[in-house]
């Protein structure tokens, strides 16, 4: 296989480079022996751990790459020592000038091979995760997955793959622990030990998802054995995707009214109350975070839909009439169309009872933003709604809100906008 050949070639170059470095150290003055011995002490165990033959199982690649990265870092440090001004003259008298050029050339090759190897490891991991998903493997190394996700380039597809893998194979405790670790590393956020302990001990009680989770704003855990009555006040969770710009904290107590939520024709009153308690705080970002997908902001109302918040959380916008509501719904539907919720039109029809985004028969009065509150099955987070299907209902909606009397509330869409996600 291509990746196996690349790894083998990479290790050949790495071995050659290591030997050249060691040979150079041996020719240095006695005063440099201390540095040489220190380098040798660090490198030798790592080289011994490197398998002679690349393991067949992809599971070991992550540990393997950890060793490779450590070796490369040590070799870079060793190279800088060799060509430093302090020992340059010794090297000059001990060997030809061409040696440094050869060494630099070898280092360049090594760097290129390392880049190829890392790129291949990303593809290997993705292929491995997909295979696990398709074969229904019962166990997956979440630690390895976390390393892959937080140390490789992020894309929408890789985030979705990581998300599905977490849903499918992790216990709630593992899911949230490794998700937080990946997020903190990505955003360069300092971990709060006390908060981490609270989250890890509380989240295992989470059996159902908040509307924000259903809309794709965060990772989540499902525990079908948990009793909603056991949740009560003690479940307080903080949820953030690597792409998010806001960290959302909320209480779940009022969201556990399963029967009311599942049978309501619009948003349940308890959900609206829960949004009143939302605390939204900016997430600290670094340069790495700026390379991720654009962040999504939570837009919510607590005044019967009279206002909503846009990307600038300090900017309050009025929803006085049809035009503004069309703008809000248009953004919402565009997002739903691109957010990997429903696999296709037929799938949507089959799953309509458990995923009621909207009521197709009464679109203007019942724009349902209910989450899935089903403890029996996990949500389908694959594909997207068919554009034609969404467009048909959007067109009907736009036509229905051309009022003869603009202030007549009966012709307006439901004012119960609780949570919108705007691009």
Curated annotation (Swiss-Prot):
Q: Name one GO cellular component term.
A: virion component
In terms of superkingdom, the source organism counts as Viruses
UniProt induction comment: Expressed in the late phase of the viral replicative cycle.
| Cellular compartments annotated | Virion
Q: Which UniProt keywords apply?
A: Late protein, Virion
Family according to the record: Belongs to the asfivirus E423R family.
User: What is the protein name for this chain?
Assistant: Uncharacterized protein E423R
The species is: African swine fever virus (isolate Tick/South Africa/Pretoriuskop Pr4/1996)
Q: What is the lineage of its organism?
A: Viruses, Varidnaviria, Bamfordvirae, Nucleocytoviricota, Pokkesviricetes
């Amino acid at each position: 296989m291509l990746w196996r050949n690349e790894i083998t070639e990479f290790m050949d170059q790495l071995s050659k480079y290591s030997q050249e470095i060691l040979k150079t150290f041996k020719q240095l003055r006695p005063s440099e022996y201390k540095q040489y011995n220190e380098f040798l002490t660090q490198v030798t165990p790592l080289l011994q751990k490197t398998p002679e033959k690349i393991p067949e199982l992809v599971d070991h690649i992550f540990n393997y790459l950890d060793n490779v990265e450590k070796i490369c870092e040590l070799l870079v440090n060793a190279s800088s020592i060799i060509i430093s001004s302090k020992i340059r003259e010794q090297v000059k008298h001990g060997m030809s000038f061409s040696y440094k050029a050869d060494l630099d050339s070898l280092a360049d090759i090594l760097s290129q091979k390392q880049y190829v190897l890392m790129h291949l490891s990303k593809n290997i991991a993705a292929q491995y995760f997909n295979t696990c998903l398709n074969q229904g493997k019962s166990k997956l190394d979440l630690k390895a997955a976390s390393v892959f996700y937080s140390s490789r380039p992020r894309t929408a597809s890789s985030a979705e793959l990581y998300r599905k893998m977490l849903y499918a194979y992790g216990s709630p405790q593992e899911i949230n622990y490794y998700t937080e670790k990946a997020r903190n590393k990505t955003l360069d956020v300092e971990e709060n030990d006390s908060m981490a302990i609270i989250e890890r001990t509380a989240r295992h009680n989470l059996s159902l998802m908040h509307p924000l989770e259903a809309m794709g704003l965060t990772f989540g855990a499902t525990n079908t054995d948990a009793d909603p009555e056991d949740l009560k006040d003690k479940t307080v969770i903080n949820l953030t995707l690597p792409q998010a710009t806001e960290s959302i904290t909320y209480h779940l107590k009022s969201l556990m009214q399963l029967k009311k939520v599942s049978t309501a024709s619009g948003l349940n009153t308890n959900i609206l109350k829960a949004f009143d308690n939302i605390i939204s705080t900016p997430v600290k970002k670094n340069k790495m975070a700026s390379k991720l997908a654009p962040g999504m902001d939570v837009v919510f109302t607590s005044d019967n839909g009279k206002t909503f918040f846009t990307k600038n959380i300090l900017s309050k916008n009025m929803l006085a009439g049809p035009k503004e509501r069309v703008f809000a719904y248009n953004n919402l539907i565009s997002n739903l169309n691109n957010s990997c919720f429903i696999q296709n039109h037929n799938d949507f029809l089959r799953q309509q009872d458990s995923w009621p985004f909207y009521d197709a028969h009464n679109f203007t009065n019942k724009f349902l933003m209910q989450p899935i509150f089903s403890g029996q099955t996990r949500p389908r987070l694959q594909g997207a709604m068919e554009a034609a299907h969404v467009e048909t209902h959007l067109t009907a909606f736009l036509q229905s809100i051309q009022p003869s009397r603009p202030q007549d509330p009966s012709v307006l869409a439901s004012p119960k906008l609780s949570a919108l996600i705007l691009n």
